[in-house]
């Protein structure tokens, strides 16, 4: 319940005791609003506890400083025996006095009204357990908190790493936010995210204003732009961005041309080469990962096919759309042929690597090779499945390969690294493509395991904070 400006121990010194803190229960107000509530129970006193509530002052007009309201109270036998209110800072008598109950509850009413309006219109899933909706709503509320002005992207929050400006143009921050807001009916927020990203971070040549462009994410971006048009009919917004959208598609066309210029005997002939993971460019020799990862081609197919369908509606050149469709058909055939040719059926389950020509499984490669071209296979497999361009038998084979060769933990795609006996990682946001394919293939039990494991193992319970 503390912040960098106020501590609940100011009201009750015992709230600093480790034993009491370890017995805390956590949640958020109303099940989803970004107000943190913690209950700490006294050992041996089941009817006694401390209740802490903290939320941001939505009436504050500071540009960067976050003003906060705090309530710390002690309860015995169901009755409040002591309570302390604070607005942002400790008392500094006589100029700054303690907050009053009237001030606190007036601010709380304003806070609730603010967030109900901000999340108004968000789709509510029809589920027996309403807490799944709460979890989703809280995710959108948290996104609005993290994004300065509500639309400027941030990959992380608070701490220097990942909140630094060098991550602001991260393609995944755009695609995951844009996608989620579209699917949950938050079209106004999706439009705000779209405008900000293309105006601030997409250059005239189609590349993002960030290091390490990820090839697959260009394709996903095109697909999501087409989805936005289908869901909203907002062609004028996309027409304004037409030159940059065309440039994005051209980035992929240029990579495709390079792949087609390779010898037909090359493993990567006809498959898009390039970085699949942004971090690749930070290594001494980034060319190790300038490779024909299957995910690059899969999401490119998806992007070309989808954007071509709505290109004439946007006033785009019909010849361009026809060319993208032709390229997608050619690439789809090449992708399937390469995958089938690179299945290792001497292993059980059969193994297919994240790129053609691999001799080792991803686990073996990460253990035996100092730097492995199969690094970050979790992204490569998840994106390959997310694109939904594989025949069902190949999609099943890829999922079985990831599961059977140590690429999942509790049903969730692992953040795959060299294995060690003391730990297993679960992957955060990138893994959603894997889950989507489970659902499309009617692998319902595996999908449910994924969803529950992600909720209860990747996210902290109550406060819904997920690891990367």
Q: Which residues does each PLM region occupy?
A:
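Hydrophobic/aromatic-rich effector regions of fungal transcription factors
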Residues: 220-231
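Aromatic-lined carbohydrate-binding/catalytic grooves of carbohydrate-active enzymes
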Residues: 152, 193, 197-219
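Acidic/polar, glycine-enriched structural segments that form the non-catalytic walls/loops
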Residues: 21, 28-167, 235-237, 249-251, ...
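Beta-strand-rich N-terminal accessory domains
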Residues: 1-18, 28-30
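The feature captures the catalytic groove of carbohydrate-active enzymes
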Residues: 78-104, 209-216, 254-329, 362
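Active-site lining segments of carbohydrate-active enzymes
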Residues: 151-172, 207-211, 229-230, 236-290, ...
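Active-site core of glycosidic bond-cleaving carbohydrate-active enzymes
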Residues: 168-203, 239, 243-246, 250, ...
């Amino acid at each position: 319940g503390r912040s960098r400006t106020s501590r609940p121990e100011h009201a009750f010194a015992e709230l600093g005791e480790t034993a009491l803190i370890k017995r805390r229960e956590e949640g958020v107000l109303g099940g989803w609003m970004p107000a943190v509530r913690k209950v700490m129970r006294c050992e041996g006193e089941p009817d006694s506890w401390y209740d802490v509530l903290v939320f941001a002052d939505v009436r504050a007009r500071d540009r960067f400083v976050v003003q906060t309201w705090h309530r710390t109270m002690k309860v015995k036998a169901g009755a409040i025996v002591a309570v302390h209110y604070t607005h942002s800072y400790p008392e500094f008598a006589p100029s700054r006095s303690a907050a009053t109950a009237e001030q606190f509850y007036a601010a709380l009413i304003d806070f609730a009204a603010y967030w109900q309006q901000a999340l108004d219109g968000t789709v509510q899933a029809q589920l027996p357990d309403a807490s799944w909706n709460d979890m989703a709503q809280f995710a959108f509320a948290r996104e609005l908190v993290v994004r300065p002005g509500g639309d400027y992207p941030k990959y992380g929050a608070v701490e220097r790493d990942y909140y630094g400006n060098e991550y602001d143009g991260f393609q995944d921050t755009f695609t995951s936010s844009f996608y989620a807001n579209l699917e949950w009916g938050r079209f106004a927020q999706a439009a705000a995210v779209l405008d900000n990203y293309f105006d601030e971070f997409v250059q005239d040549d189609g590349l993002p204003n960030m290091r390490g462009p990820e090839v697959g994410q260009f394709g996903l971006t095109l697909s999501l732009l087409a989805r936005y048009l289908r869901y909203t009919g907002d062609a004028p917004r996309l027409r304004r961005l037409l030159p940059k959208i065309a440039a994005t598609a051209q980035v992929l066309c240029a990579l495709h041309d390079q792949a087609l210029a390779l010898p037909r005997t090359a493993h990567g002939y006809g498959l898009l080469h390039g970085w699949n993971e942004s971090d690749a460019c930070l290594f001494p020799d980034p060319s190790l990962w300038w490779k024909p990862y299957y995910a690059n081609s899969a999401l490119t197919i998806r992007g070309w096919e989808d954007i071509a369908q709505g290109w004439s509606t946007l006033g785009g050149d019909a010849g361009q759309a026809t060319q993208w469709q032709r390229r997608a058909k050619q690439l789809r055939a090449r992708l399937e042929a390469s995958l089938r040719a690179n299945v290792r059926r001497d292993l059980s389950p059969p193994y297919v690597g994240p790129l053609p020509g691999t001799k080792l499984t991803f686990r073996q490669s990460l253990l035996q090779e100092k730097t492995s071209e199969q690094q970050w296979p979790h992204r490569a497999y998840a994106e390959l499945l997310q694109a939904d361009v594989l025949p069902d038998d190949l999609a099943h084979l890829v999922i079985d390969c990831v599961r059977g060769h140590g690429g999942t933990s509790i049903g969730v795609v692992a953040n795959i690294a060299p294995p060690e006996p003391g730990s297993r990682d679960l992957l955060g946001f990138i893994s959603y493509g894997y889950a989507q394919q489970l659902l499309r293939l009617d692998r319902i039990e595996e999908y449910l395991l994924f969803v529950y494991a992600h909720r209860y193992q990747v996210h902290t319970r109550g406060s819904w904070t997920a690891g990367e």
